Structures are given as structure tokens and as C-alpha cells.
């Protein structure tokens, strides 16, 4: 390979270096590399907008510590980008600019730039320039000796003048010179002197300690001081530790700053004490702060005087009287004790009056002979004793008055109750209560005067009972949650339960008969014509106006029949309404509506859509019981959860009690009973009630209005006002008027008399037992019975065979599953019966089984008693349990005396009769039903722990043999084997 020489010049030097040129024979061919595909390119393109916003976002921290982005707006991002572009452009122009030569660089040297430039004169100065020069004053610095001399001079001056020195470091320390034990000593201001109780009473740094050592060295610094001579007012005094004698705590720096003593030991203010020592320490503060607060505020708070004051009373006596007044008005052991203040503030008003009365009397006794000099104090204490004298309140009189008229809130009893409460409070009444009592007394005087005048007149010409022009506010019809989008009332579950009313007490209007067949409403003393015929609207205006007139029926004028009174006062809701001149308001033509409930007596009436019945036909109340519309109106105020119980109570309890054509008083009484169960119905609005004095009938207007006009209008518009009729003391003829009746379609409701409530409904023991036997081998029937009448389970205790048959068929387990989430008391009953079946199965004889069942009656009765209940078998179950319980108690007494009461033959006969009844229930089944019962019993075996069989043979074996014989036949081959299998299954 050839070698060549190359020359490199370094200034004037030359350097020659050999080199060999590279061979060009081998050419390295670059390998083509396929371009890589970025898998995230598309994702970055999609997220470019988000990443751009995230690039300029800032980070912020939420209250819960979460870090989040705070994104900029598009306008803010544009401004930021423009700013960055401008900055990059300026930097680019600077980098691309031509180079410049820097000839000189000076740092804090040379002439300032302003002198290198020529100064052009701005004008001619016509005044003499200022010749004064600024003088720089030297900083005065003291040497250590001069500083010590200054401190010494300040100490001498302040100690002679009893002045103060402030030492300012990180915080200010106040040093005061005062005379203590015959010498002037320095004292600092501690925390307890400012009213603060802290474990460390005084804190200072080392620089302050050094100055305190110099300032505390007064003339008698070295004199001996004993700790027993330290008294109150010496707090904060700086003493010499070396000259201090006695029992004292630790200190530092040769200084002892007095704080207080505990158990004879003197403590330094800089020492940290425990909390127990702090609470019981005697601190040596004085009363200067008290007198400072008194002197500083006395002149500012005193009132102006109309004379010139002179000092005529001794100061010491004034101080003694001031202490007497303080203990008479604000008694305390220590004036600075917060516990005494809290106890005083927490006293009831009655106890405070007693305390002030006692202390005012003690203050008068302590004043003694000085009452002639301090006559103003004597007069004040006498007035205080009189004002706080306890009043002897006779609670028996208050209780007697309250029992008589406490529940009466109408005038004048309301005013009497106000005065009764006023007298009970005695001197605790406020000024407002005094004013209310005076107004009540004024109302009583007016009432008595008016009553006397009316008695003298002996007529009702002054009776007025105006009908309010304002409609009642019904919350249930105004709540948005109860209305649909068209502002119509939503019945919800109430609509379903309202069918109990429509199925029993309403009838469908038959279009084939026409509306005219339903126009006449009959009542015991006459008829009333409905406006149902006007549902067919005539298009002729004259004919339509003629129909709007109605059929006028003349009623007698306002008389005593229209009024209701109690204790000589009118009960206005129970009276007929009148006009301003005293004449009665007569009813007008009420137009009909379709499928509406019309409620409201004052103002405009309200139309509520009726609940839907079983069909789309119109419904009308059956002849004779229009009062059921009152309960239908009450259903509006009933919650959906209580709608079922409410409708059942009305159907099973109220309607049987009212009977046919009840009086207004009976209807009001049932409404009062329903209000106890459902308090929300107290303000339920009623339909308009028309009073017919000629026939002594009250008509409840329904959706079909009234064609007959001229009736009086009852003022009662709500349930609470209607209940006022349910009062024997109410003097009223209207309360004896008839209002509607019971439907003819359900006469059986009142056929049975209940021993628990008059006119109620109850199922007999034999009927209930037949119903129970009917469902033992019918799973679907038993399930429905458990849902409708769960207390049928109790009747299983009448027979051990029935009890174990129900257990083996899983009926108790089914009852627990059905009622465990609905009503746990019924689930408890089923559990007790299941456990009872376990114990009964272990008994060998029938008498032993009866004894076990009778002993469990008490627990079952406790679990069954659950207040008022609407189930028909509930009173039957209670009666059965009560009979068994009473029998067990009587038999137990005889058994303990040695006389067994069970007659074996009687028990066997009863059990045999019930067993045959159980067998007959199974015999009535066809082959398929018998197989179904057998299969269900086999499945029920899996859900219970064990299947129980009685040890006495004959009863259940006959049942099993009857089933197998019916299924397989008596002579079928292999029948014995199949019988055994079926017996095991059962």
C-alpha cells in the first residue's frame, strides 16, 4: 500500500505526517432496514387534543388530598402559545445577530454610564444652587462597660421612683420595682397575675435572665429573707437564692421568682408544676387588678347626678356594705371562682328566687344598726326580699281546674286555662305573659256580659255562623309526590284496597236502565233527587238553564234545631251556616260529575278522581248508605302502607257497628275511633253535608250532586270538626239525624257477636277448626289460609294428632318463611308450635301429651297477644288459649293436692273424634289428590329435621293404609313393599 506525507501548519511551524489512503475496492453496502411502524401513532393522534390541554394544565390538591389537573381554557392556551412563540422568536433573532466586540468590562469600577454621555443643558438657572451638604452622623455604640453603667443608673432611678423597665427580646418582660419586706425589690409580671393558670408561670430566655440578675441587685439584695414571711401580693418578686431561707423549690441563675406555695413549700414561677399542684396552689397575687378594674370603670359607668357629691360615709364601712351587697345579690365563696359563677348561673329560676330571698333577709340582719346611715341599701334589700318571696302554689287546685277544663280549648275555657297556667308560674311570669293574662281576663269579662245579655233576650236572632269563603288547605292534595303530571291525585296502593268499598257498598250503573233509574235516593222519611240525569247535557241553552234551577224544597228558618251548643256556648262547626242577616244558607243545584269524589265544604269544592273499580262503569252508592263517602274521603289522608288495615277496619268494624241508617253521633264516634288508629285523618276534608230538618236527615253529597235544593248546609268541613258530634254533653238535634246505612248485599257482617267488642265479627271455634282441617292436606289452601288467617295455627293445640300432622307436613316451617319478614310475632308462634310438636312426640300416652300442650298455653298466649287485630280468627285463638291456660292453672292446683283431673276416657273420645275428622278430609280426595298429598308430605320431610310419629298405634296407620289401599289395591302383588315405602315417605 502506498504511503504519502501530509503537512500541517501551526502558525509558522510545519509538521509532516505520513498517511495511507483508504482502499476503494471494498464498498460496504448499507442494508435496507424496513421502516418501523409506531403502534401508538393513532392513539397519540386521537389524544393529541387532550395531551395538549394536559401539557399546559396545572396541578391542584383537593380537600381530601387528591391531586387533580386544572385545565386551561382554549383562550388561555392560545395566549400561552403566543407568548412562547414570541420568546422563541426573540431568542432566534438574538442567536442569528452579527457578532459584536466587547472591548471593556468593568465591575464596580470606573465612571458611571451617565458621566460618559454628554449632558445637554436644559435651561438657565436663575437661582443660587443649594450649598448645604448632607452630613453623615456617626453611629453611637456603647461599650460593655458603658452598657453596664447605663443599666446600673436605670436600676437606681427606677428603684427610687418605683418605676418599671421593659426588657424586649423575642417577647417583652415587664419589670416593676415595689416595696417588699421593708426594701425595694424587682418583680416581674407572671401569668397568674394576668388571670392565666399555667403549669409554667413565667418564661424568659438567657439574655433576659442576665439582665434580670443586674436589675434585681438592689440595696438590700443580700439581706436574708425567710419563706414564711412571703405573703399575698409578693407574686413575681425576684429574690436572691443564696439569702433565701426556708422550704422552697428549685431555681436557676441565682434568682428565685416568687409564684406561690403548696403544703408549705414555696415555688419558683419558672418551675413546671403538676396539674394537681396547680389546682391546689396558693398563689401570692394581690387585688390590684380588681381595684384597677373597679377604679377604671366606676367613673365611666356612673350615671349623672343632680347634686354635688361629698364624702360623708366612712370608706371602711362602705367596703363592708359593698361586701354585704355582693353576698346578697351574687353569693359566692371567692369572687374569682368560675365554679361558683357556673353554679349560680345554672340554678332554676324558682331556686334562684328562694336563694335571693334568703340572702336578702340575711343582708338585712347583717346591716343591723347601719340601716339608718345606709338607708338606700336597707330599702333595696327590703324590696328584693319582697319581690323574691316564694308564693305558696296549691298544685291540687291547679290539677282540679285542669281536670275539669284542661282539654277544652274553645272560649271561655281557653282563657281560663291561660289564667290557670299564669297563676301556677307565680312570679316567674314575664311581661308578655302578664299582658296575655290581662287580655284573657278581658275576654272572660266580655263573654260573661254577652252571655248574660243573650240569656235575658232568650232568642237566637243574634246567631251568626258564616261559611268561610276560603277553601281549606289540604296538604295531601297539594304535595307533588301525590300528584301526576296532570296534577291529578295518585291513589297508588290505596286504589287497590278501595275495592273493599266498591265491591260491598257501591253498585254499577246499568246503562240499559238509564240514568233516570238512579235519580231518586230513598231514606226512611222521604226521598232526595240526584242530578245524575244532567250527565246528558242538552244543547239548547234555555233548557239547560231550566235544568240548572233544580227542585226547591222549603226548609224551616233558623231555629234551635240548626244550632249545637255545649255549656251554653255554640259549637259552630256543628251548626247550620247562615248569611250576614242571620238567615240560613240554602243549598243550590249541585251538578254531577263522572267518576269523581267531591270534597270540601268552604270555598270551591275539590274534585278527586275516584279509584278504579273492577270495571270501567260508573259507580253509585247503594240505597241507604251514602255516608260511606266520608270514609272514602278519609282514605285520601291514609298512607299507602295503612290503606289495607284502614279499609278492613271500616268494612269489619265500623259498618257492623253503624248498622242501617246510623245517627250523626254514631258516625262521628266511629270517625273518632278511626282517628285514634290513623291520626293523619284529623284534617281530612269531608264531602258537603246537607241538613233536611223536615225529615231529620243529613245527606252526604256524592259525585252525582243534588237536584233537590233548599237544604241547610252543615259547617263541619273536616273529620276533626265532625268528631265534635260524638259528645253526649252536646245539646244538638242534628246529632240525632240519620245519615245513610249498610248495604243489603252483606247482611252477614253483623250476624256474629264478638265477646271482645260489641257488634264485631268473630269466627267460631268449630268453624275455624274445620277450616284448619280442610287445609292440612291441601298445600295451596293452607298457604292461602296462612296469609289470610295466620292465627288458625293456634287451633292445632286442640289435638296432638293435628299438631303432629301439621308438623310432618311442614306447615309450621312454611308459616315461619311467610311471616318472618312481615310480622315476627306470628313467626314466633309457629316456632313455639314446632317445638311443642317435638315435645309431644316424645310422650307415651295421650294424657301426657295433653299435659304438655296445656303447659305451653301460657307462652303461646303471651306471644299471641298483639293488641288490636283485624284477623277473624285472632279473637278465636285468644279465647282458645285463655281457656286452655285457665284449665291448666286449675288442674295444676288439683294435681299438687293429689287429685289428678284428667279423665282418660274423655280425652280419648275427643281425640278419636278429631282423628276421624282428619281422616274424612283425606277420604274425600280422589286418587290424584291422594297421590299429590303423599308426594307433598314426602317433600316436606326434607325441609324438617325429623318426622314424628305417635307411639300409639292405630290412628296414623289407618290413614297410611287407607292411602296405600286406594292407590295400589288390597290384593296387588308386591303391595306390602309399596305400602312400606309410602309409610316411610309419610
From Swiss-Prot:
List the catalytic residues: 192, 201, 235, 626, 699
Query: Which residues belong to any copy of the Peptidase C6 domain?
Result: 618-740
Entry's EC annotation: 3.4.21.-, 3.4.22.45
Q: Note the superkingdom of the native organism.
A: Viruses
**Where's the motif Involved in virions binding and aphid transmission?**
592-594
Q: How is it modified after translation?
A: Potyviral RNA is expressed as two polyproteins which undergo post-translational proteolytic processing. Genome polyprotein is processed by NIa-pro, P1 and HC-pro proteinases resulting in the production of at least ten individual proteins. P3N-PIPO is cleaved by P1 and HC-pro proteinases resulting in the production of three individual proteins. The P1 proteinase and the HC-pro cleave only their respective C-termini autocatalytically.
The UniProt site entry described as Cleavage is assigned to: 284-285, 740-741
The GO biological-process annotations, alphabetized, read as:
proteolysis; symbiont-mediated suppression of host innate immune response; transport of virus in host, cell to cell; viral translational frameshifting
Please give an example of a GO cellular component term from this record: host cell plasmodesma
Q: Name one GO molecular function term.
A: serine-type peptidase activity
**PROSITE patterns this protein is in?**
HC_PRO_CPD (PS51744), PV_P1_PRO (PS51871)
Q: What is this protein called?
A: P3N-PIPO polyprotein
Q: Which organism is it from?
A: Potato virus Y (strain N)
Amino acid at each position: 500500500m502506498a504511503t504519502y506525507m501530509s503537512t500541517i501548519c501551526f502558525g509558522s511551524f510545519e509538521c509532516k505526517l505520513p498517511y495511507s489512503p483508504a482502499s476503494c475496492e471494498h464498498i460496504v453496502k448499507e442494508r435496507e432496514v424496513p421502516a418501523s411502524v409506531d403502534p401508538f401513532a393513532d392513539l397519540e393522534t386521537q389524544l393529541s387534543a387532550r395531551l395538549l390541554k394536559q401539557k399546559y394544565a396545572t396541578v391542584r390538591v383537593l380537600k381530601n388530598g387528591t391531586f387533580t389537573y386544572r385545565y386551561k381554557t382554549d383562550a388561555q392556551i392560545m395566549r400561552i402559545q403566543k407568548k412562547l412563540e414570541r420568546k422563541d422568536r426573540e431568542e432566534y433573532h438574538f442567536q442569528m445577530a452579527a457578532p459584536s466586540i466587547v472591548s471593556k468590562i468593568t465591575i464596580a469600577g470606573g465612571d458611571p454610564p451617565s458621566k460618559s454621555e454628554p449632558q445637554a443643558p436644559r435651561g438657565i438657572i436663575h437661582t443660587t444652587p443649594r450649598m448645604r451638604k448632607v452630613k453623615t452622623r456617626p453611629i453611637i455604640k456603647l461599650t460593655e462597660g458603658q452598657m453596664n453603667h447605663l443599666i446600673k443608673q436605670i436600676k437606681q432611678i427606677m428603684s427610687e421612683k418605683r418605676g418599671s423597665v421593659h426588657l424586649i427580646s423575642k417577647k417583652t418582660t415587664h419589670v416593676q420595682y415595689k416595696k417588699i419586706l421593708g426594701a425595694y425589690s424587682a418583680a416581674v409580671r407572671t401569668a397568674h397575675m394576668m388571670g392565666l393558670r399555667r403549669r409554667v408561670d413565667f418564661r424568659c430566655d438567657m439574655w433576659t435572665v442576665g439582665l434580670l440578675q443586674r436589675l434585681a441587685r438592689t440595696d438590700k439584695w443580700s439581706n436574708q429573707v425567710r419563706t414564711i414571711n412571703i405573703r399575698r401580693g409578693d407574686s413575681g418578686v425576684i429574690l436572691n437564692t443564696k439569702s433565701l431561707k426556708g422550704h422552697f423549690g428549685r431555681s436557676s441563675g441565682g434568682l428565685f421568682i416568687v409564684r406561690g406555695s403548696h403544703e408549705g413549700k414555696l415555688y419558683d414561677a419558672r418551675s413546671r408544676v403538676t396539674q394537681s399542684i396547680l389546682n391546689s396552689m396558693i398563689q401570692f397575687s394581690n387585688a390590684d387588678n380588681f381595684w384597677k378594674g373597679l377604679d377604671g370603670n366606676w367613673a365611666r359607668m356612673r350615671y349623672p347626678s343632680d347634686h354635688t357629691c361629698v364624702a360623708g360615709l366612712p370608706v371602711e364601712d362602705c367596703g363592708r356594705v359593698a361586701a354585704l351587697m355582693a353576698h346578697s345579690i351574687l353569693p359566692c365563696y371567692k369572687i374569682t371562682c368560675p365554679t361558683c359563677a357556673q353554679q349560680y348561673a345554672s340554678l332554676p329560676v324558682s331556686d334562684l328566687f328562694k336563694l335571693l330571698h334568703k340572702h336578702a333577709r340575711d343582708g338585712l340582719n347583717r346591716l343591723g344598726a347601719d340601716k339608718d346611715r345606709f338607708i338606700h341599701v336597707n330599702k333595696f334589700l327590703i324590696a328584693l326580699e319582697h319581690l323574691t318571696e316564694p308564693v305558696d302554689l296549691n298544685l291540687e287546685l291547679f290539677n282540679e281546674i285542669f281536670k275539669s277544663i284542661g282539654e277544652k280549648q274553645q272560649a271561655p275555657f281557653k282563657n281560663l286555662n291561660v289564667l290557670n297556667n299564669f297563676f301556677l308560674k307565680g312570679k316567674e311570669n314575664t311581661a308578655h305573659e302578664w299582658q296575655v293574662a290581662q287580655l284573657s281576663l278581658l275576654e272572660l269579662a266580655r263573654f260573661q256580659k254577652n252571655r248574660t245579655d243573650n240569656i235575658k233576650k232568650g232568642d237566637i236572632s243574634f246567631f251568626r255562623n258564616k261559611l268561610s269563603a276560603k277553601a281549606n288547605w289540604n296538604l295531601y292534595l297539594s304535595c307533588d309526590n301525590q300528584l301526576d303530571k296532570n296534577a291529578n291525585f295518585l291513589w297508588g296502593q290505596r286504589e287497590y284496597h278501595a275495592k273493599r268499598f266498591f265491591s260491598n257498598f257501591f253498585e254499577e250503573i246499568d246503562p240499559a236502565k238509564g240514568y233516570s233509574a238512579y235519580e231518586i235516593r230513598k231514606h226512611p222519611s222521604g226521598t232526595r233527587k240526584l242530578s245524575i240525569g244532567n250527565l246528558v247535557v242538552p244543547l239548547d241553552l234555555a233548557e239547560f238553564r231550566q235544568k240548572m234551577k233544580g227542585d226547591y224544597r222549603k226548609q224551616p228558618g233558623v231555629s234551635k234545631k240548626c244550632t249545637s251548643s255545649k255549656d251554653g256556648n255554640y259549637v259552630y262547626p256543628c251548626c247550620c251556616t247562615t248569611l250576614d242577616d242571620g238567615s240560613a244558607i240554602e243549598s243550590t243545584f249541585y251538578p254531577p260529575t263522572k267518576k269523581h269524589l267531591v270534597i270540601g265544604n268552604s270555598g270551591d269544592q275539590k274534585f278527586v278522581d275516584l279509584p278504579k273499580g273492577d270495571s270501567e262503569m260508573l259507580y253509585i252508592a247503594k240505597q241507604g248508605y251514602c255516608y260511606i263517602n266520608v270514609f272514602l274521603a278519609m282514605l285520601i289522608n291514609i298512607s299507602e302502607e295503612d290503606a289495607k288495615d284502614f279499609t278492613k277496619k271500616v268494612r269489619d268494624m265500623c259498618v257492623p257497628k253503624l248498622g242501617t241508617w246510623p245517627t250523626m253521633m254514631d258516625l262521628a264516634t266511629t270517625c273518632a275511633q278511626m282517628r285514634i288508629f290513623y291520626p293523619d285523618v284529623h284534617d281530612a276534608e269531608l264531602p258537603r253535608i246537607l241538613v233536611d230538618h223536615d225529615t231529620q236527615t243529613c245527606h252526604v253529597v256524592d259525585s252525582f250532586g243534588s237536584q233537590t235544593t233548599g237544604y241547610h248546609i252543615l259547617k263541619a268541613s273536616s273529620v276533626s270538626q265532625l268528631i265534635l258530634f260524638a259528645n253526649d254533653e252536646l245539646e244538638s238535634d242534628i246529632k240525632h239525624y240519620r245519615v245513610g246505612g249498610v248495604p243489603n248485599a252483606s247482611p252477614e257482617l253483623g250476624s256474629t257477636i264478638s265477646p271482645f267488642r260489641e257488634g264485631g265479627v268473630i269466627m267460631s271455634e268449630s268453624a275455624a277448626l274445620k277450616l284448619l282441617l280442610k287445609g292440612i292436606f291441601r298445600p295451596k289452601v293452607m298457604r292461602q289460609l296462612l296469609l289470610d288467617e295466620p292465627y288458625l295455627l293456634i287451633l292445632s293445640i286442640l289435638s296432638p294428632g293435628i299438631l303432629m300432622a301439621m308438623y310432618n307436613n311442614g306447615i309450621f316451617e312454611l308459616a315461619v318463611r311467610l311471616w318472618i319478614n312481615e310480622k315476627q310475632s306470628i313467626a314466633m308462634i309457629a316456632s313455639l308450635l314446632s317445638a311443642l310438636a317435638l315435645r309431644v312426640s316424645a310422650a307415651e300416652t295421650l294424657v301426657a301429651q295433653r299435659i304438655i300442650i296445656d303447659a305451653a298455653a301460657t307462652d303461646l298466649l303471651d306471644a299471641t297477644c298483639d293488641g288490636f287485630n283485624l284477623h277473624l280468627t285472632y279473637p278465636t285463638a285468644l279465647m282458645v288459649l285463655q281457656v286452655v291456660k285457665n284449665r291448666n292453672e286449675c288442674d295444676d292446683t288439683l294435681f299438687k293436692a293429689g287429685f289428678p283431673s284428667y279423665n282418660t276416657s274423655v280425652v280419648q273420645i275427643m281425640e278419636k273424634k278429631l282423628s276421624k275428622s282428619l281422616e274424612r278430609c283425606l277420604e274425600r280426595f280422589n286418587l290424584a289428590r291422594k297421590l299429590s298429598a303423599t308426594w307433598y308430605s314426602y317433600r316436606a320431610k326434607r325441609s324438617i329435621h325429623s318426622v314424628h310419629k305417635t307411639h300409639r298405634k292405630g290412628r296414623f296407620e289407618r290413614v297410611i293404609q287407607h292411602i296405600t289401599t286406594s292407590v295400589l289395591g288390597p290384593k296387588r302383588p308386591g303391595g306390602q313393599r309399596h305400602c312400606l315405602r309410602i309409610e316411610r315417605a309419610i
